Amino acid sequence: MTANELTTGDFTDADEPFSLFGTWLKDAEKNEVNDPNAVALATVDPDGLPNVRMVLLKGFDEHGFVFYTNFESQKGQELLSTRKAAMCFHWKSLRRQVRLRGPVEIVTAEEADEYFRSRPRGSRIGAWASKQSRPLESRFALEKAVAEFTARHAIGEIPRPEYWSGFRIRPTSIEFWHDRPFRLHDRVEFRRPVPEGGWEKVRMYP
């Protein structure tokens, strides 16, 4: 399926954003070569300077968009401080983009435990071994830490570190964009004043 074969005009008739996002994500899973769930995550530091990096979306529903990280990392510290974030998905093969922003909440311990158990064993070891976002003296130091935690957790389940969990963005704004000829793109934004409120749909100039 190519971008031209998609029923791109129909998305402007959608009444709410979550089912539309689900449809677009499924299209991306069929067309994007690598990581269709990759998303740019923007946060802000104490000086008001933005930071952005790619993360992987690990779940979404009508409550929000979920990803996981080390809370002691730069993004973890910034999210714990401001409790606000923005995301941008860009699916180049489909010529589509989705932007969203809103307040952030921590997922439940049960959600974090369930996802942590689903990760490959090596990734769970890595969560213990990596002091994310802090200076690393050498690659050998990281590999040594991996070896030490591998030995420590050689038998049985690997517990989730207390500093490792997930965040959920509860969007108050979600914008859908699709490329059109002559840069006359389609843009539709769904807005609500609070995460629990109803959606207002606004068509935007490109």
Curated annotation (Swiss-Prot):
SUPFAM superfamilies, sorted: FMN-binding split barrel
GO biological process, one term: pyridoxine biosynthetic process
Designated name of the protein: Pyridoxine/pyridoxamine 5'-phosphate oxidase
Pathway per the UniProt entry: Cofactor metabolism; pyridoxal 5'-phosphate salvage; pyridoxal 5'-phosphate from pyridoxamine 5'-phosphate: step 1/1; Cofactor metabolism; pyridoxal 5'-phosphate salvage; pyridoxal 5'-phosphate from pyridoxine 5'-phosphate: step 1/1
EC number(s) from the headed UniProt entry: 1.4.3.5
InterPro entries: Pyridox_Oxase, Pyridox_Oxase_CS, Pyridox_Oxase_N, Pyridoxamine_oxidase_dimer_C, Split_barrel_FMN-bd
Subunit structure of this chain's protein: Homodimer.
Organism the protein comes from: Sinorhizobium fredii (strain NBRC 101917 / NGR234)
Sorted UniProt keywords: Flavoprotein, FMN, Oxidoreductase, Pyridoxine biosynthesis
Function, in words: Catalyzes the oxidation of either pyridoxine 5'-phosphate (PNP) or pyridoxamine 5'-phosphate (PMP) into pyridoxal 5'-phosphate (PLP).
Pfam families for this protein: PNP_phzG_C, PNPOx_N
Domain of life: Bacteria
Residues that bind substrate: K58, Y115, R119, S123, R183, L184, H185
Cofactor dependence: FMN
PANTHER family according to UniProt: PYRIDOXINE-5'-PHOSPHATE OXIDASE, PYRIDOXINE-5-PHOSPHATE OXIDASE
Cofactor mode of binding and number, as noted: Binds 1 FMN per subunit.
UniProt catalytic activity: pyridoxamine 5'-phosphate + O2 + H2O = pyridoxal 5'-phosphate + H2O2 + NH4(+); pyridoxine 5'-phosphate + O2 = pyridoxal 5'-phosphate + H2O2
Residues given in the record as FMN binding sites: R53, M54, V55, L56, L57, K58, Y68, T69, K75, Q97, Q132, S133, W177, R187
